[in-house]
Amino acid sequence: MLNMESPQMYADAVQTLAQLDLKKEPPLQQATIGQITLTAMSTAQQQQQQQQQQQQQQQQQQQQQQQQPQQQTTDANNNTSQDAALLVKQHAMHQMQQVAALGSNNNLLQKQMLQQYSTQTDLDELTTQEITLDLQHLIDDQFRDTETLGIFSDMVTSPGGLSATLPPSGMVSAAAKVLQQQTLRNQHGYGGRGGGGGAGGALAYMPQPVHATYNNSSDENSSVGSDSSTIKEEPIDPEYRRHLQEAASQQAAFMGNGAGLYNGYGSGANGLTGGGNPLNGGNTTPSSNGSNGSTGSSNGSQFTNLTTANVLAHHNLPHLAAAAGAHNLLKQHSKLHAQQQHQQHQQQQQHRKHSNKHVDKGTDEYRRRRERNNIAVRKSREKAKVRSREVEERVKSLLKEKDALIRQLGEMTNELQLHKQIYMQLMNHANPEVSRVCRSFLNTNEHSL
C-alpha cells in the first residue's frame, strides 16, 4: 500500500502507473503472439502469470475503493484514463487465456488421437482370427455315404450300364428300385420252373447292372417315394410316355415274331433262347437241368412274360429297359435287313449269269443279225476315220495360215520401224513445217499402238 500525503501526489502517481501500464501493453501483445507461435511454454507458468495479474488488479481496485473520497476533486480525465487502462488489461488477459486454452486443447487432442490409433492397430493385429476351412473333410463327409448319393448311386454301382439311356435325373433311382422289386418277384415266382435259372434268367433282356444289391433291404410293398433319395420327381411328359408305350409295343411285336424273324439265331422251341440270343446282348441263360428238354421253352416263356410294361406303367415311370431293348431290337433288325439285301443281290447276280438264253449260232437269223451288226460297226468306223481325217486337214490349214500371218506381221513391224527412223531423222529438218508433220505422225502412231 502506498501512503500518499496529498491528493495531488496520488493523482501524479496514478498517472505514472497508467503510463507504465500503457507502455507495458505492447510486450503483452507480443507475448500473446509468441505464445501462438511457440508451443514450448508450459500451462503451469501461464496459470501463475494469470494469478499474479489478477492479484494486481484486485490490489488496484482496493486502492481505488479506499481513495475514492479523496479523488472526488480530481479531473474526469484521470478517471477515463484509468478505465481505458483497465479495459486494455482485461482484453489482453482474455486473449492470453483463450490462446493458452486452445494450445493446450490441441496438444491434448493430438496426443489422444495418437494413443488411440496405436492401441487400435495393436488390438487389431492381436485380435484378428485366421479363417480356415477343411475342404477335404467337408467333401468326404458330403459324399461318403452311398445311400445319400441319390441319383448318383445308379451311376456309381452300374459301370456303363444305363448311362446311354438315362431319362431326366429324378427318375433313375425310383425306376431302379421298381425294377429290382420286379426282379425279386420274378425270382420267387419262376425259381422252380427254370431249374435254378431265376438269378441268371430273370430280366434276361435287361442290362445286368440293374441287379445291383445296394437296396435289397427294401420291402416289396414299400412305395416308390420311400427311396433314400429326397429328390422331387417331375411329372412325366405325355408325349414321352406315349413314345415309351410305342417302343414297348414294338418290342412285344418283335418278340412275338421270334419263329419267323429270329429263327436262324435260336436253337430252342421258339427261336428266342440258346447260345447266341440276340435279345439279351449275347448272354446265355444257363440252367442246372441240362438234360431236361423243356428248359428252352420255360426260358422262352419266362422271357416273353417279362416283356410286358404294365408294372412300370402302373407306377407312371419310364420303362428304361423297354427303351434299351427296343433300341437293341432295331439294331438287330437293321443288321438282318442289310444281310438279307446283300444275299438277295448276290442271288440276283448269280441268277443273271445262269439265266442267259441258249442261242444257236448256226441259224440264219443269227447270221443276219451278226452281218447287220458288222455292217453298222464298219460304217461307224469309216465315219470316225473320215472325221479324224477332216480334223487333221483343218489343223494343217490353220497352222499354215498362222505361219503366213506371223510372217506378214514381221514384215509390217519392220516397215514400221523403218518409217519411224525416217521420221525421226526428218524431225531435225530445217523446214519447220516438215518437222511439225513428222512429230504429229509419230504421236498418232504411238497413240494407235
From Swiss-Prot:
Indicate, by first and last residue, each region the UniProt record lists as having compositional bias (Basic and acidic residues): 357-368
Family membership noted in the UniProt record = Belongs to the bZIP family. C/EBP subfamily.
**Coiled-coil positions:** none
Q: What's the source species for this entry?
A: Drosophila melanogaster (Fruit fly)
Question: Where do the segments described as Leucine-zipper lie?
Answer: 398-405
Q: What is this protein called?
A: CCAAT/enhancer-binding protein
Give the matching Pfam families: bZIP_2
Question: What's the chief localization of this chain?
Answer: nucleus
The UniProt function text for this chain reads: Required for the expression of gene products mediating border cell migration. Among the DNA sequences that this protein binds with high affinity is a conserved site within the promoter of its gene.
The source's domain of life comes to Eukaryota
GO cellular component, alphabetical, reads: nucleus
Q: List GO molecular-function terms, semicolon-separated.
A: DNA-binding transcription factor activity, RNA polymerase II-specific; RNA polymerase II cis-regulatory region sequence-specific DNA binding; RNA polymerase II transcription regulatory region sequence-specific DNA binding
Can you state the subunit structure given in the record? Answer: Binds DNA as a dimer and can form stable heterodimers. Interacts with trbl.
Where in this chain does the record put each bZIP domain?
A: 363-426
